[in-house]
Swiss-Prot record:
This is Protocadherin beta-7. CDD domains: Cadherin_repeat. It is a single-pass type I membrane protein. It comes from Pan troglodytes. Residues 27-688 are extracellular. Residues 710-793 are cytoplasmic. Glycans are attached at N169, N418, N436, N567. GO terms for biological process: cell adhesion; homophilic cell adhesion via plasma membrane adhesion molecules; nervous system development. Keywords: Calcium, Cell adhesion, Cell membrane, Glycoprotein, Membrane, Repeat, Signal, Transmembrane, Transmembrane helix. It comes from the Eukaryota.
Length: 793
């Protein structure tokens, strides 16, 4: 069956144009749509997008919903096309009962922005029910003395349909004695009366069996039948007569079942069985029969079921009084049901938005409707929420309310809100309903990660393992989810000379710091860098902290003997006159340690000697002195092994081997200073030498002769007391900055001896080229200063 969709348009005259322009959809006539009952599910009713003047996309984007009072899902809105479809078959009799027209109101709710349109679905009746008599057989007793034209009330049929499909006519099977008159009760119900056409003769026909047919107005019409049995009696010339033809009574809806509503009374002037009256309902509907019952003897009307003002406000009953002779009379009882405050307000939630963003003020959290089935003040309601919440209630049309956030929320303070909506009516006593809503607050990236400290100090012992962390930093973010996930990183170094990327790394997930290589205290004692903490949001927020790394010294350098050199192919021999007194300074062992602190404190001791007890070594300065007078028995060649040990844990050591030659007497040898290695990097010096050589060949010849003479002297003096200073590997901080691998001139020495003196000492001369020191780094100068001070430079 096709659904016929109509939209009622009414023309109105208005006095002022401004009044017309100020009218809103909420106050306009509702949209009306019509559909026949029993229409198949999925039937197209209308296109709401066209009716509302909206595009299909706009209709979907605005979150259109269908809300009905009955909360029934009888309509379906297609979000793709905007079509309004029937969601289920409708039974008009079940939905509306006898009410006509059958109108189902509903609302079209648009959320973004909030807007409400009223609409109505009119369900058209179809002829799907035939008239039905409650009693298949109707019995009548008629006195034979009854005059023609007398009317006898018959039981009416019931038809659940309404309008033209409802009960419209009665007929009776053809006969000469009776016909049917149809009467309207004034409330849309018709009932039949059997009218006598001619005088009865009990002796001729004592009983009649006629068929009463009830017809409805449908097309084609439906019908129902009942058998009417008429028993012709002797004369009973008085029918029962009610004291009042109309009874009106008001009954509270909370009256208990079984309570008396009203008592009706009729009189009959006859005697005997003809005067005995029985009360009963006449053409009563099924609803009346379920709600009321009447005492057939006393005429007392009682409640059979609980009344409900919200369902039916008025009942109209027809009561018949019939005597024993078959005569009857009737009266009408009108029962008005009065309302009491027996219904709590109802909260119908249309939509709920949860979670909501914490930085979104004036956000519609929920849309709901308040309904109270009572009337008057009993149906008026007041709606409220707690005072200490950042939300407000805004009333709208048709008892709709919106719950709106009043100001920006702070998820870090409250992650959720438990809102209790209290609805109270104005009846006596007041009834209230509470509805709890939990609103979750979603996180917004409004907090940057924060380090637990503004600066960190890490202590790392040198020669550390790169696989082990040297420390960690930690930052927390008060946000949640990805907004709280922290990524750690190294920030660019502010020191351009610090190779930070090759020195340390950081674990981006947990902030653990790693040294990419083993640290060397002698090369780098401390450094600092900045680390950053960034969350994973977009845009991301970040913070930074300063990390100080202090390298702790380890005893990883053994003492290094500067003098005498131990890697020379020609051993160093020190001359010692046999006439030397005890305490005579033979030589001095000079050593340095690349470590610092107590790891660099050196002590000296004599480990081995050719003549034990002949020599002694001072523990703190390394001076080798005679311990007694020399004798002729002492060997001419003495070999001493001096142990140099630092104060580390565990201690490291080195040995120096000395050769001492005992002589009877000698003059002061002249030892030529070793030639300093040329600085190949100094091109200016080369250019100057070339220029001087080209200008004066005579000067060059003089220099060559001078060198030849010096070499001759050196060859003659070598066997006696000469100490060679050969080239060899040195600690890095002792090697010349030119990179030639030779000992820096600042550590070259000349031995000066005077014959015949028993207190001769070594004199360590100042460097020949003092301007080399400023070329070294500040750290190297600082490391060398203790050694220079010990030597008295």
């Amino acid at each position: 069956m096709e659904a016929r969709v109509e939209r009622a348009v009414q023309k109105r005259q208005v006095l002022f144009l401004c009044v017309f322009l100020g009218m809103s959809w909420a106050g306009a006539e509702p949209l009306r749509y019509f559909v026949a009952e029993e229409t198949e599910r999925g039937t197209f009713l209308t296109n709401l997008a066209k009716d509302l003047g909206l595009g299909v996309g706009e209709l979907r984007a605005r979150g259109t919903r269908i809300v009905s009072d009955q909360n029934m899902q009888i309509l379906l809105l297609s979000s793709l096309t905007g079509d309004l479809l029937l969601n289920e078959k409708l039974d008009r009799e079940e939905l509306c009962g006898p009410r006509e027209p059958c109108v189902l109101p509903f609302q079209l709710l648009l959320e973004k922005p909030f807007q409400i349109f009223r609409a109505e679905l009119w369900v058209r009746d179809i002829n799907d029910h035939a008239p039905v008599f409650l009693d298949r057989e109707i019995s009548l007793k008629i006195l034979e003395s009854t005059t023609p034209g007398a009317a006898f009330l018959l039981e009416s049929a019931q038809d659940s349909d309404v309008g033209t499909n409802s009960l419209s006519n009665y007929t009776i099977s053809p006969n000469a004695y009776f016909h049917i008159n149809v009467h309207d009760s004034g409330e849309g119900n018709i009932y039949p009366e059997l009218v006598l056409n001619q005088v009865l003769d009990r002796e001729e026909i004592p009983e009649f069996s006629l068929t009463l047919t009830a017809l409805d107005g449908g097309s084609p019409p439906r019908s129902g039948t009942a058998l009417v049995r008429i028993l012709v009696l002797d004369v009973n010339d008085n029918a029962p007569d009610f004291v009042r033809s109309l009874y009106k009574v008001q009954v509270p809806e909370n009256s208990p079942v079984g309570s008396m509503v009203v008592s009706v009374s009729a009189r009959d002037l006859d005697t005997g069985s003809n005067g005995e009256i029985a009360y009963a309902f006449s053409y009563a509907t099924e609803r009346i029969l379920k709600t009321f019952q009447i005492n057939p003897t006393s005429g007392n009307l009682h409640l059979k079921a609980q009344l409900d003002y919200e369902a039916i406000q008025t009942y109209t009953l027809t009561i018949q009084a019939k005597d024993g002779g078959g005569l009857s009379g009737k009266c009408t009882v009108v029962v008005d049901v009065t309302d009491i405050n027996d219904n709590r307000p109802e909260l119908l939630l249309s939509s709920l938005t949860s979670p909501i963003a914490e930085n979104s003020p004036e956000t519609v959290v929920a849309v709901f409707r308040i309904r109270d089935r009572d009337s008057g003040n009993n149906g008026k309601t007041v709606c409220s929420i707690q005072d200490d919440l950042p939300f407000i209630l805004k009333p709208s049309v048709e008892n709709f309310y919106t719950l709106v956030s009043e100001k920006p929320l702070d998820r870090e303070r409250n992650t959720e809100y438990n809102i209790t909506i209290t609805v109270t009516d104005l009846g006596t006593p007041r009834l209230k309903t509470e509805h709890n809503i939990t609103v979750l607050v979603s996180d917004v990236n409004d907090n940057a990660p924060a380090f637990t400290q503004t600066s960190y100090t890490l202590f790392v012992r040198e020669n550390n393992s790169p696989a082990l962390p040297i420390g960690s930093v930690s930052a927390t973010d008060r946000d949640s989810g990805t907004n709280a996930q922290v990524i750690y990183s190294l920030l660019p170094s502010q020191d351009p000379h610090l190779p930070l990327s090759s020195l340390v790394s950081i674990n981006a997930d947990n902030g653990h710091l790693f040294a990419l290589r083993s640290l060397d205290y002698e090369a780098l004692q401390a450094f600092e860098f900045r680390v950053g903490a960034t969350d994973r949001s977009s845009p991301a927020l970040s913070s930074e902290a300063l990390v100080h790394v202090l390298v702790l010294d380890a005893n990883d350098n053994s003492p290094f003997v500067l003098y005498p050199l131990q890697n020379s192919s020609a051993p160093c021999t020190e001359p010692l006159p046999r006439a030397a007194e005890p305490g005579y300074l033979v030589t001095k062992v000079v050593a340095v340690d690349g470590d610092s602190g107590q790891n660099a404190w050196l002590s000296y001791q004599l480990l081995k000697a050719t003549e034990p007890g002949l020599f002694g070594v001072w523990a703190h300065n390394g001076e080798v002195r005679t311990a007694r007078l020399l004798s002729e028995r002492d060997a001419a060649k003495q070999r001493l092994v001096v142990l140099v040990k630092d104060n580390g844990e565990p201690p490291r050591s080195a040995t120096a081997t000395l050769h001492v030659l005992l002589v009877d007497g000698f003059s002061q040898p002249y030892l030529r200073l070793p030639e300093a290695a040329p600085d190949q990097a100094n091109l200016l010096t080369v250019y100057l030498v070339v220029a001087l050589a080209s200008v004066s060949s005579l000067f060059l010849l003089s220099v060559l002769l001078f060198v030849a003479v010096r070499l001759c002297r050196r060859s003659r003096a070598a066997p006696v007391g000469r100490c060679s200073v050969p080239e060899g590997p040195f600690p890095r901080h002792l090697v010349d900055l030119s990179g030639t691998g030779t000992l820096s001139q600042s550590y070259q020495y000349e031995v000066c001896l005077t014959g015949g003196s028993g207190t001769n000492e070594f004199k360590f001369l100042k460097p020949i080229i003092p301007n080399l020191l400023p070329q070294s780094t500040g750290r190297e100068v600082e490391e060398n200063r203790p050694f220079q001070n010990n030597l008295g430079f």
